[in-house]
């Protein structure tokens, strides 16, 4: 069993906020045919269903962002799950809008929802980070995350949310590389590939130097006619 928790703030006034992109992603998953209507339990809106043959509990904590861990932790303990069974979907300031990353564990990076999950669930859960971009000025961050997405953002936001739902089985099974490729394809961004390792080449030699090296015998003959001739030429004595 897996818990997929979208992070956000409850209430109509926050519904369109950038900070609520985690809720939006879980809403997209809940629209899959296998999921039940939303109900309330564990201080959250929940919906049970299946993805790729595995039982999944979708959660939207009603505790507000900075107490999200209370809700998710309660469900984790109820079902006797571990942090490895939890997938948190959240907004990420440090990624360009529409870019995505996924990882296990790590720091909370100042995100209050993750900070709460760390405290109540442990740190070794998977995090699907959805980029909302940075406003460029620290003073504008609060207004940016609690501001609504612009109409122009729908160009990448809607395809991203659809792609998360369409490729939900990859999310649940941990096929992270394939999932990142699918999400990048949907938003028109390029997934970052590992940079090839540069192999050091031997220092280039001039053609003359190469010819000298190849023409020069590795060892001079010690006996025979050639040896006698060399002795006479260079005055080498026994």
Swiss-Prot record:
This is Peptidyl-tRNA hydrolase. HAMAP family: Pept_tRNA_hydro_bact. GO terms for cellular component: cytoplasm. TRNA binds at residues 14, 64, 66, 112. Its EC number is 3.1.1.29. Belongs to the PTH family. GO terms for molecular function: peptidyl-tRNA hydrolase activity; tRNA binding. Keywords: Cytoplasm, Hydrolase, RNA-binding, tRNA-binding. Hydrolyzes ribosome-free peptidyl-tRNAs (with 1 or more amino acids incorporated), which drop off the ribosome during protein synthesis, or as a result of ribosome stalling. It holds the Pfam family Pept_tRNA_hydro. Monomer. Its main location: cytoplasm. The keyword Methyltransferase does not apply. It is found in: Cytoplasm. PANTHER family: PEPTIDYL-TRNA HYDROLASE. It catalyses: an N-acyl-L-alpha-aminoacyl-tRNA + H2O = an N-acyl-L-amino acid + a tRNA + H(+). Residues 207-216 have a biased composition (Polar residues). The record marks 9 as: Discriminates between blocked and unblocked aminoacyl-tRNA. The record marks 91 as: Stabilizes the basic form of H active site to accept a proton. One of its GO terms (biological process) is protein quality control for misfolded or incompletely synthesized proteins. The gene is pth. PROSITE patterns: PEPT_TRNA_HYDROL_1, PEPT_TRNA_HYDROL_2. Residues 202-225 are annotated as: Disordered.
């Amino acid at each position: 069993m897996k818990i997929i928790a979208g992070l956000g703030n409850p209430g109509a006034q926050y519904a369109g906020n950038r900070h609520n992109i985690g809720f939006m992603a879980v809403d997209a998953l809940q629209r899959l045919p296998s999921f039940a209507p939303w109900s309330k339990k564990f201080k959250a809106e929940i919906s049970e269903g299946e993805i790729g043959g595995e039982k999944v509990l979708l959660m939207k904590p009603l505790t507000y962002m900075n107490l999200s861990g209370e809700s998710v932790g309660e469900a984790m303990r109820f079902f006797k799950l571990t942090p490895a069974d939890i997938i948190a979907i959240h907004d990420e300031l440090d990624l360009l809008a529409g870019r995505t990353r996924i990882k296990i564990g790590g720091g909370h990076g100042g995100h209050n929802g993750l900070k709460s999950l760390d405290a109540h669930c442990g740190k070794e859960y998977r995090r699907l980070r959805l980029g909302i971009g940075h406003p460029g000025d620290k003073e504008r961050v609060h207004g940016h995350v609690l501001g609504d997405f612009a109409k122009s953002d729908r160009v990448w936001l809607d395809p991203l949310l659809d792609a998360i739902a369409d490729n939900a089985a990859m999310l649940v099974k941990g096929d992270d590389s394939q999932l990142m490729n699918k999400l990048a394809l949907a938003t028109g961004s390029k997934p970052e590939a590992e940079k090839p390792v540069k192999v050091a080449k031997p220092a280039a030699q001039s053609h003359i130097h190469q010819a000298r090296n190849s023409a020069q015998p590795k060892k001079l003959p010690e006996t025979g006619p050639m040896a006698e001739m060399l002795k006479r030429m260079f005055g080498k004595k026994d």
